[in-house]
């Protein structure tokens, strides 16, 4: 039986995974849709690992059973049973498909539940994800470029073969790019990207991928090197919308929607504080590139804009610091980067013209 094919099918189907690894392992990397219900917590796993090194496998196994027994064992068993009842098509998963998933499988069988496990565990799924990404990005790639506020992400999302890298990374790429959802670990981001590629590829006869023109990193996540190499050679279509239209997109995204999201998440007072800190942090992150004097001036303008927004709800004041930020920093930076790829540009136009051009391809 072809295990790689089975792994692909499991990932494409969003098969629920009951991941019994320790929390620290899960945080370092997990598959999309996995839930972490550990057999051993971090300290328990560390103790068993130390015992294994000093006294061998049998002693470590014995210690593990002593640590996870009685009420602790029963509580964890109830959690696994509840997870299986919620996800009857789920699979058990540990690091390598070894003792931990087999132990949990056996304990569940003793209660009348027969839950399958992932042969090879997370490591096998991880290797499948890495290999799938490498294989799939060999297909042609078309990049959508343009200055900040050009609506590139929206264009990508509209394409049936579009891959929203920023959505997968939970970050919009700029110093103001973070969202309310924390970014995933690097391995989890790569896994999520691989699954997205597999899903899109399975839905259609794919001629090429459509991606946003990104740098090496999106927030804390960096793009897999195999993808970066392919993107560096890819043709680019550039969105060139009027400056005023870009400002309105940025107003909606950063001053209206982010304000709403923070208030929704943390309430009026806490949300406003978080929103204010978010904007200040974005400006602070590029203070050295702006120069400390310019940074201080724009920070003062930001403070006045926030006071205005708080008092009357208007976001107009933010234009007084956003416009110079675009003119003096973001636009020159992107245009400089784009000049280095000038030979790859295949089309330029407004957002609608690019959308029409993409449909015609």
Curated annotation (Swiss-Prot):
InterPro entries named in the record: Rhodanese-like_dom, Rhodanese-like_dom_sf, SelU
Gene Ontology biological process: tRNA wobble uridine modification
Transferase listed as a keyword: yes
GO molecular function, one term: tRNA 2-selenouridine synthase activity
Record's function text: Involved in the post-transcriptional modification of the uridine at the wobble position (U34) of tRNA(Lys), tRNA(Glu) and tRNA(Gln). Catalyzes the conversion of 2-thiouridine (S2U-RNA) to 2-selenouridine (Se2U-RNA). Acts in a two-step process involving geranylation of 2-thiouridine (S2U) to S-geranyl-2-thiouridine (geS2U) and subsequent selenation of the latter derivative to 2-selenouridine (Se2U) in the tRNA chain.
Enzyme Commission number(s): 2.9.1.3
Keyword entries, A-Z: Selenium, Transferase
Taxonomic placement: Bacteria, Pseudomonadati, Pseudomonadota, Gammaproteobacteria, Enterobacterales
Residue stretches making up the Rhodanese domain: 11-134
UniProt record similarity statement: Belongs to the SelU family.
The protein, known as: tRNA 2-selenouridine synthase
Gene of this entry: selU
The keyword Transferase is assigned to this record: yes
Domain of life: Bacteria
Subunit structure: Monomer.
Catalyzed reactions: 5-methylaminomethyl-2-thiouridine(34) in tRNA + selenophosphate + (2E)-geranyl diphosphate + H2O + H(+) = 5-methylaminomethyl-2-selenouridine(34) in tRNA + (2E)-thiogeraniol + phosphate + diphosphate; 5-methylaminomethyl-2-thiouridine(34) in tRNA + (2E)-geranyl diphosphate = 5-methylaminomethyl-S-(2E)-geranyl-thiouridine(34) in tRNA + diphosphate; 5-methylaminomethyl-S-(2E)-geranyl-thiouridine(34) in tRNA + selenophosphate + H(+) = 5-methylaminomethyl-2-(Se-phospho)selenouridine(34) in tRNA + (2E)-thiogeraniol; 5-methylaminomethyl-2-(Se-phospho)selenouridine(34) in tRNA + H2O = 5-methylaminomethyl-2-selenouridine(34) in tRNA + phosphate
Location of the active site: 94 (s-selanylcysteine intermediate)
Pfam families listed in its UniProt record: Rhodanese
Top-tier EC class: transferase
HAMAP family: tRNA_sel_U_synth (MF_01622)
